From Swiss-Prot:
UniProt cross-references to Gene3D superfamilies, sorted A to Z: 3.30.300.20, Ribosomal protein S3, C-terminal domain
Subunit structure: Part of the 30S ribosomal subunit. Forms a tight complex with proteins S10 and S14.
Descriptive protein name: Small ribosomal subunit protein uS3
Listed SMART domains: KH
SUPFAM superfamilies: Prokaryotic type KH domain (KH-domain type II), Ribosomal protein S3 C-terminal domain
Species this chain originates from: Shigella flexneri
Length: 233
């Protein structure tokens, strides 16, 4: 029986960055890992309606820095920054060190696998037909410039007695190409018939140059210089 490696795991260090970037000795490693897990668990539960894509944790010099990638930064920040300050205090209590929280906006949620999967699950929980939800997600991603997308749902689809798997693909999704920038994520829809699993693969193109090209900050587009009009003498 064929087995598939995790699409993100095999690309770590090639074209995918880690979600936790810190170094610890043997004594501190387990505690750091445990607090990382608890911080992610708390933020995921607290920001369930804020369209959170990923949470990146860094630990510089006895402190913790959490970057929340979200499509709805206004909900995370709250009125005058009250909500984000509350999150910062709880994260500091969980980690036991001073905390800093940064918010990064996801510009195109239709091209983010986690947000697409969450969108499909929320539609399934509202009793939208699964085929319609899948096709809508595929069309939106391709319209916004994805090279390819594959969506798979499995479970008691439409309330059927026997669980089955259905998938829909458009474009190309080259899983064997390690330099391919493939965003993969999953989500679960809790319906009256049981749990329906959703998997999403989005191919955004190939990254040439490895991690150096990934970590390079995007340069802002150069604005054309305005020509100064000479005044009449």
């Amino acid at each position: 029986m064929g087995q598939k490696v995790h699409r993100n795991g095999i690309r770590l260090g090639i074209v995918k960055p880690w979600n936790s970037t810190w170094f610890a000795n043997t004594k501190e490693f387990a505690d750091n890992l445990d607090s990382d897990f608890k911080v992610r668990q708390y933020l995921t539960k607290e920001l369930a309606k804020a369209s959170v894509s990923r949470i990146v944790i860094e630990r510089p010099a006895k402190s913790i820095r959490v970057t929340i990638h979200t499509a709805r930064p206004g909900i995370v920040i709250g009125k005058k920054g009250e909500d984000v300050e509350k999150l910062r205090k709880v994260v500091a209590d969980i980690a036991g060190v001073p905390a800093q929280i940064n918010i990064a906006e996801v510009r195109k949620p239709e091209l983010d696998a986690k947000l697409v999967a969450d969108s499909i699950t929320s539609q399934l929980e509202r009793r939208v037909m699964f085929r319609r939800a899948m096709k809508r997600a595929v069309q939106n991603a391709m319209r916004l410039g994805a090279k390819g997308i594959k969506v798979e749902v499995s479970g008691r689809l439409g309330g059927a007695e026997i669980a089955r798997t259905e998938w829909y693909r458009e474009g190309r999704v080259p899983l064997h190409t390690l330099r391919a920038d493939i965003d993969y994520n999953t989500s679960e829809a809790h319906t009256t018939y049981g749990v329906i699993g959703v998997k999403v693969w989005i191919f955004k193109g190939e990254i040439l140059g490895g991690m150096a090209a990934v970590e390079q900050p995007e340069k802002p587009a150069a604005q054309p210089k305005k020509q100064q009009r000479k005044g009449r003498k």
